[in-house]
Amino acid sequence: MPKDKPHVNIVFIGHVDHGKSTTIGRLLYDTGNIPEQIIKKFEEMGEKGKSFKFAWVMDRLKEERERGITIDVAHTKFETPHRYITIIDAPGHRDFVKNMITGASQADAAVLVVAATDGVMPQTKEHAFLARTLGIKHIIVAINKMDMVNYNQKRFEEVKAQVEKLLKMLGYKDFPVIPISAWEGENVVKKSDKMPWYNGPTLIEALDQIPEPEKPVDKPLRIPIQDVYSIKGVGTVPVGRVETGKLRVGEVVIFEPASTIFHKPIQGEVKSIEMHHEPLEEALPGDNIGFNVRGVSKNDIKRGDVAGHTTNPPTVVRTKDTFKAQIIVLNHPTAITVGYSPVLHAHTAQVPVRFEQLLAKLDPKTGNIVEENPQFIKTGDAAIVILRPMKPVVLEPVKEIPQLGRFAIRDMGMTIAAGMVISIQRGE
């Protein structure tokens, strides 16, 4: 039986109006994956007999977006010869960042779209920095709107140099830079004859070569809990996605911060594991599972708890502890000062946190300190801060278990900042 092709999740990033949606639209259009609802609309409007034009599809997609309906993300899947690709999101969604951090959909790669006309713009930098903060390892650069610069090689090389400088500064290496015109369909799926000077991959060929995501099986077991069910005749069944490590039937797991909150170990033996209603002996990273735990009641645990082995339990940050984090402020109406208390979203947990100290302001591009102990930080700033949770929460330093070290800061219905945990300081 042929081994299944690897599944790869990608996000599209880049400055507003540089052509992210058009590029996604072109990929779907040229691979025959236009969302159902668009095709339906086409038929309803009696457009039969007319050809199903790309421009028409893009207008419909744009209308849907303006009405606040983003095309159902589940539809944005397509295949390349060696990969199943899911486009999990594109910025512009209000919850883009939160989804990328807390969603079940950690991106494996990002496509950075840069217009040949403008070159690197402020949001290009912000999104690239964000990709790094969110731990996206692979980047593909699409230099779009080549039709607007007459497919000029010199202009392509100029913009390519700008992007390379930015990404190398952020620590990215070995990324393809592809000249495309999403609107004209050049070098997206079909190889372009307008740019004979370019002999690298098309966008879809580059997507086909994204390295297969590694499964972090050697890290300690961590399963953030999404829900807890009580099933007659079975018992308590927590449900969650294995982020790291592996879980076998018969092992003993402990739940945190539940154990810390109740001042007693909330733990038990795993009697069974199920995935998609099939029994499993062993669960691996990426598996969405339900598992039955002996001696743990439904009221002991809840969404936001994390299961781990008793030999290496999840790390709890208590209310007397603090943690040091690197954040990037994405969207704050005024400025963040010490004492600010928004909500932290990490894995499946949500807890209020307080900004205890602003240690340093960083240059978002280089990560170098530009100001020690700033009075405030505002939109666009990167900073090192000390945060204190107002309720116990499981967090891990990003160097140790990155899946549990990234977080979003939310307030007033929007994502204020994204960040990663550098270290945890124990209070007495």
From Swiss-Prot:
Cellular component, GO annotation: cytoplasm
Function in brief: GTP hydrolase that promotes the GTP-dependent binding of aminoacyl-tRNA to the A-site of ribosomes during protein biosynthesis.
Gene3D superfamilies: P-loop containing nucleotide triphosphate hydrolases (3.40.50.300), Translation factors (2.40.30.10)
EC code(s) of this entry: 3.6.5.3
Subcellular location: Cytoplasm
Region (G1): 14-21
Region (G3): 89-92
Protein name, UniProt field: Elongation factor 1-alpha
